[in-house]
Structures are given as structure tokens and as C-alpha cells.
Amino acid sequence: MKRLLRGALGLIALLGATGGATRLWLGAEVPPLGGREPVAGLRDSVVVLWDSLGVPHIAARDEEDLFTAIGYLHARDRMWEMDLLRHAALGRLSELFGARTVGADRALRTLELGRIAAAQLEIAGPEGHRLLEAYAHGVNAWIAQGRYRAVEFRIIRHAAEPWRPEHSLAIGRLEAWDLRTTGDELELGDVAARLGPARAAQLAPTYPDTAPTIVPPGEWRSGRGVGAEHDAPLSSAPTLAVRTVFRRAYASAWGPYEREFAGFAPASNAWVLGPSRTASHKPILANDPHLTLRAPSIWYLVGAHAPGYEVVGATIPGIPIVVLGHNARLGWGFTNAMVDDVDYVAEQLSPDSTRYRTPDGWARTEVVAETILVHGSTPLVYRRLRTADGPVIERAGHEAGPPLAMRWVAHDPTDEIGALRAMGRATDLPSFEAALAGFRSPEQNVVYGDAAGNIAYFLAGHVPVRHGGAGFGAASGWAKAGRWDGYLTAAELPRMVNPAQAYVVTANNRVIGDEYPFYISREWELPYRAQRILELVRQDSAATTTSVARAQLDIVDVFCRAIAPLAARAAAATGRPDLAAGLRAWDGAMSPERAEPTLVWSWYRELQRLVYDSVSPGYRPAEPLHHWLARGRSPWNDLSALERRAMATVLPRAAERPWGSVHATVQEHPLSAVPLLGRLLRFNVGPLVTPGGNYTVNVASTDEFAAPFASTWGPSMRHVVDFGDVDGAGGFILPTGQSGYPLSPHYRDETTRWLKGQLWILPLDLQRVRSVSRLVLVPDGRGGR
């Protein structure tokens, strides 16, 4: 997308202004925080107290006015972001950016997020409809006022169209897609075809037997004994489709969407401590979702106050409800549950593609007509196919092989907005658990704490039940094996209330061990963050919000600490005993000023390349390599020799370079690459020298194999709450700021606090809000809704 926007330079020429005048002209587009503003759709006045970080604390007389106000404020601060997400969710990016995003739009249309959103709206019920309509009224009131149009709209010469309730739902499903766990089944199916199932099994993800699970052994007490957690045999069918159809289609179509617009990554930390482990003798809950770091931030903080719904926390612009936060009695946090929620099904079509083969015979293929409007060009009209298994992924070019349909749990309509609203309204553990039962996608690990002293864990979401287990590769649409037989019930999902250990820790690690009778997934995040959090929790017997916030900043990498002796051995063997001594003494802290992180991580990445490139080029799973490093041998090659070779390769570039010189975070704005304009407006936030790494609690991860190791995702928000003092300790913080206007003082004013782990309290008692400005939203005189 960055290349698409270089043409925006013409706008600068049209301004006929100097750089300073340009900044002044654009800066005038930032709306003031105070005053009175009429809002169509309101029935009564709504008071907004702005604190010094630009967080709105909203007081309304009923929920509908509250959500109208949230919609208005979201649009006021983040309308460009909302509009971009809406176009991405609906596969309409080409309306903004022209022909170069047609491939991405075709892929996004295949996800059918608009169809799902329409189905969700049908099941939302009267209250859900009112909530979503109220939010849309607020957004549209801001669009209609016509002032303070974000500079991004000027650059691409576009105006936001009216907001509809289904747009919010489509954005919600876009987030679910970003959090999916597609896993490595397609790559492994291809490996099985080339090298055989036995060899592919050696590359399959494994979770260490001794690594921590979220639900410890002995805590699962279900009386049910059906199903199987065991993997199905590796399948080799139909790998031609996997390799040539899906992979290349993904790279050419979904790939651009993923790089430019996706905001989410499957990782986070959340933990809750019981009363016996805290200084206040009340639970303390902590959460930091690890998502793509971008500008503006994914999240928007609010204090939401109306009778029956008083919640503080993080919202997503475009979605009307608090997603993560707490009320006066209870709170919750999320991490991705890593559920295996997407399967691919190879379909056998008739010669004219009008029918497809099923286990019960031939069925008629559904044909979906699509029209993509293209800025500066003629519309693209085409047809795509759908089967009972899901939408059929389009082939790339003239590649051979059977077509693949995609089965995804989020294709079934569910009411997450209603569930989140009910969670915010809950007053105790039973009412919260009842509300959570409606939350189905994306699947989440949910940690819970309340003022009554309870702590709990729940796996929330749809977990498919597969006929015959879960294999690798694509299932065959004409066979029963691998097909879905519904979902686990709420009673069958893992849960844990007031565990004996008096804490719950989740870091995308395995949910539960072999005692659990149902299949959830085979792919979990490696256990290092969970192990380190457990170390810190067990060392802190009288925790406070200060000590918990400090734990969120921890930069000890358990994995790098474990492999440092191996790196030291390799360094000594290559003639650098001085480096070997330093590595043996290193504690695993990924500090910007230390050189050991640079050397160890560079060595590990080079070793990963050497180990895999001879057998599975382009597919380098971490889990098997970590297992082989722990055992000291690989089934594929001479691991010791490769360790020495990797060290010899990286020493010249990595031996004495501080981690901070190669590891930085830039929170990028989509328009930052536009020459001159990006620099004038300082769209990006960064580069920031950031401690931590891929496996630290304070994550600063990169998915690049080559140095320098730029960090691309990390803590997108931090939240800590002590239920002994919800308004006096803990708080929230974002990595950028509240505003989407680059020249606003609130565009990047939280960054320093985020780096230092300094949280910002959002009081539930409005009398304790330290407001710096007051905005009153009033009905516009047209009678409200």
C-alpha cells in the first residue's frame, strides 16, 4: 500500500505552501476537546470529561446515549482508521487505492466477512440492534458535521460514507481472522507428500512434556470421557493443491492484506493472583495483548458510565463496546487460546464447476457474483464458488490441483458484542460466566478476578469436534474423515475456579494436558513466557500493582538463557573464548546495552536456517529445533557442526553489537512512506530502542530472519487492576496515544509511559477523574433517535 500512496505527493504541490505552513494547515484539523457539540441521535445531554492523556470519561443517562457518544468520539479521534478497517473487512480497498489492491480485495471477499456480519445482525436481538444502531448514529453524526476531516482523507481524496451496524460486526470478524490459528497443517501436508509422513512427523509442532499448561494437572474435573486429544495420522492428500494453489494464492492476495492492514498476532500475557498472594488480600489481574504495533494504536481507552453499564477499559475504533477492562466488582483479560479453528478442504468439482462431490454424493455449487469498484478504473466483475465446506479459495494464475474450500469457525454467526456488553454488566462470577458463554469467536483464554476474592480461568469460544481427529494437509471433501461434527459445549470447555495454587497464568501456552479428552490444538506458543511469568509470580508472595506492572516489563528470555551455553561452546570452538565466558555468565536479559542478546539471537536464527534449508526450504518451525537443541541432536543433520558453522557466520556482524543497535520498534502509519509528507507529519512513532525479544514477558518480537531485528509486535496495551483499590492503583497504557491526528498532542503522548511501564488510572468514580477539559454532547434538536 505504501507504493500506492506515493502519488499523494501531488497534494503537497497543490498546497503551494512551505513545509511549516503545511504543518500549520494540517494541524488546524485537530478538533478541540472542550465546548458543546450537537449530536444527532442523542436523547439527552452527555458529559465527556477529558483527562490529560486525552481519554474520554463519558457520563450518559442511558446505554443508548452512551454508545452514541462512544461512536461519536471514536469517529472524532479515529475516523480514518475506522474507515480503513471497514474497507479491508468488506474487501473494498480498491475503492481507496485503485487497481493494485484488487488482489487483496478478492482474497478478502473470499473471507465473506460482510455476509457473516449480516447474519450476526439478524441474531443480535432487539437490545443488540439498539446498541449497534446507537453507535452508528454517533459515528454518522461526526461524519455529517463535516469539519476536522483527517488528513488521510485529504491525501487520497476520499470522504467517509455513512456507518452501518454491520460495519462494526465485520470489523469484529476481521479481528477474528487476524487471530485465527491456521497452523502448519498445510506446510506439513506438503512435507509429507515430498518426504513421507514419518519425516513430516519429525517437523510437527510439539509441546514439551514438562512445560506448564494453563490448567495444571489435577484441576480438570469434568466427568465427560469422550473424544480424543490425540492427533490423527499425517495425511498426504491433496498436497498439490496445498502447495500450488493455496500457498501462492495466499502470497499474492492475502499477503498484501496481512502486511499492510492486519493488526493482530496470536500472542498475549494475562494472569490473575488470588487474595493469598497479594498485599491487598484481593485479586490482582494483569493483561497485555501482544499485537502488531502501529500508529495510531489498535486500542482506544474509555471510561463508559451509564446506569447498568459502568466499565473502564480498551475499545477498538469501529466497535462500540469495551473489549478488555473492568467494572467496580470484576475484571477480565484475554490471550489467544490457539484453537485449531480453520481447516482446508480439497473439493472435487464437476467439469463445469456446477457440482461438487460430498460423502453423500454430488451437491450443487453455490456461485457468488462479486463487483469490486476500482478507483480510477472500471469495476471488476467476477464470480467465485462456495460449497457447504465454505468459500473456495481462488487459484493463483494457471496452477493445477483441486480447489480448496475454507472451513472457519467464525463463518457461523454469533453475538460477541452482546456477550461483551453482558460481561461489562456482570456483578459476580456466575453472571460473568453466563455472559461469557455467548463469546464464541475469536477463541480466547479468559482470566477473571473480582472484589469478592474469586479468580478463574475459562476457555471461551467455538472448538470444533472433528470426525476421526485432526490430520495435516487438506481434508478430502468427498470423505468423512476430518469433517466437523459441531463444537464442544460450554460444559466441555476447560475452566478453573479458585485453583489451589491461587493464581492463573496464560501466555498462549498449552491449555491443558493429556488428561483432557478433547482435541483443542496441536500448535501452542512456546512455553518460555509462561515459564518466566510463573517464576516471577512464585517469587512475589505479597504482590502489588507496582510489582505486577514491573513483571510486565521483564526482559529475561528463558529460551536464550537456556541456549547461551550452547552458543558459548560454539564461540569457544571458533576461537573466541572471551565471548564464550561472557555468554556463560549472561542471565538472559535482553537489554539494549548488552551484546549477548545480539550474538545469541543472530546465532540461533542462522542455525535455524542451516538446519531447515536442506530439508524444508521456507518452512522453519521453531518447536522441533528447540526440542533438538534440548536433546543435543537432530534427526536431519549434525547439529554440533551446524552450531559451529552458524557461529562462524555471525561473529563478524554480531560479536560486539549492542542489542539496542539492531533491535528497535517503529510503530508505522500506513501513509508514512509517502515522501516528504510522512516526514512533515511524523506519521510514525519511533524508532524506539526497545528491550526484550521474542520470548520475553515484555515481548518485542520480529518475524524476520536477517539482522537487524526490527520489532514488529509487542504489548499493544497494558492493564493491571487490584480489586482492593480499583480506582487507586494499577491502570492502563497504550504504546502511542488516543488520537489519530498526527499533529495532536495525544497522538504519541503515551509512548514514554508505555516504555517505562507507567500505567494510567481510569477511575470508575467520576469524581476522581482529573479532567483538563469538558465536552458536552447535546441533542441536535431533531428529536433524538
Q: What is the predicted role of each segment?
A:
Residues 1-15:
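N-terminal Sec-pathway targeting helices
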Residues 20-284, 289-295, 313:
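Substrate-recognition/specificity elements adjacent to catalytic centers across diverse enzyme folds
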Residues 103, 114-115, 136-137, 413-444, ...:
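Proteins synthesized as precursors that undergo proteolytic processing into mature forms
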Residues 164, 576-666:
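A terminal-accessory region detector
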Residues 250, 263-265, 306-321, 325-330, ...:
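Glycine- and hydrophobic-rich flexible loops that cap the catalytic core of alpha/beta enzyme folds
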Residues 441-540, 607-608:
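Hydrophobic alpha-helical segments
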Residues 519, 523-576, 657-785:
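Terminal end segments
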